[in-house]
């Protein structure tokens, strides 16, 4: 072997591995290294394996070095045609495969199935929520109806009302109780308003409505609602015998002054108060009549025994069944008055 051949082989092919073998190794490691990195690593390996003797030959023969280096660089840059065909075919196959079967994301089928299952689960949940909402609305409507029914029952369970019609020029008539006005309302088809009163006693819930009749303006309609739970403050005053015990009974004494207080001619007592006074007067009359009627019967039954006794005659004259309270009071007391 000549020196020139040895130098070429030692310089251009420093190791037992050829350039093509290195190219196959580079193709195997293509996924980890790029083309420029392979080029730099090839040059670095060439310079690392060059011996000092070949380096001296390279410096002494610059002309012979330039041509093989150009060939080497071109051979490294240009890959063999077989590898280019393989890579092109692989790329075409990959592209065709990607077009036919697009790349599936990891767990795409599981995600799609999970999403469908989630939708299927959400549907019954929404239906359950709608059913619960409907049940809540039904319960609310039922409770509202019950409350309305209770309110209606409470309204229906109001106390009885009693109305009195009195001819008077004064709207608010005295009836023995104290009232406080708490409202006034216009009446339909009537020019006269309706006044509302409440009893001033705290424990009493009696109400009174006063309005003037539009058919007969001289008539006042007084409506009472409820019953008083206390005695009238006017009846608690001392009773005057002169005003209560008159010649024509309690009904005639109402205009002269009943229960110890004077009543003007323009002021009228309500029928409710009049009925109360008449009821008590009738009870007292019945008790007195039963008492003195028994005395009269006793005298009549024993008249034959006593004969024409003057004392019996006098007693008969004194005891007269007039049906009035004058029978109790002696005649001389009445004359003195």
UniProtKB/Swiss-Prot annotation:
Read off the PANTHER family from this record. WRKY TRANSCRIPTION FACTOR 23, WRKY TRANSCRIPTION FACTOR PROTEIN 1-RELATED
In its UniProt entry, what is this protein called? WRKY transcription factor 23
DNA-binding region residue numbers: 168-233
Biased-composition ranges, Low complexity, are 106-118
Q: What family is it from? A: Belongs to the WRKY group II-c family.
Region annotation (Disordered) ranges: 100-160
**An annotated GO BP:** protein localization involved in auxin polar transport
Bias type Basic residues, positions: 142-155
Organism source for this protein?
A: Arabidopsis thaliana
Localization (cell): Nucleus
* Record keywords, A-Z: DNA-binding, Nucleus, Transcription, Transcription regulation
**Task of the protein:** Transcription factor. Interacts specifically with the W box (5'-(T)TGAC[CT]-3'), a frequently occurring elicitor-responsive cis-acting element.
Q: Which InterPro entries match?
A: TF_WRKY_IIc, WRKY_dom, WRKY_dom_sf, WRKY_plant
Transcription among keywords: yes
**UniProt-recorded Gene Ontology molecular function terms:** DNA-binding transcription factor activity; transcription cis-regulatory region binding
Q: Which GO terms describe its cellular component?
A: nucleus
The gene it comes from is WRKY23
Matches recorded under Pfam families: WRKY (PF03106)
* Residues that span the membrane, as ranges: none
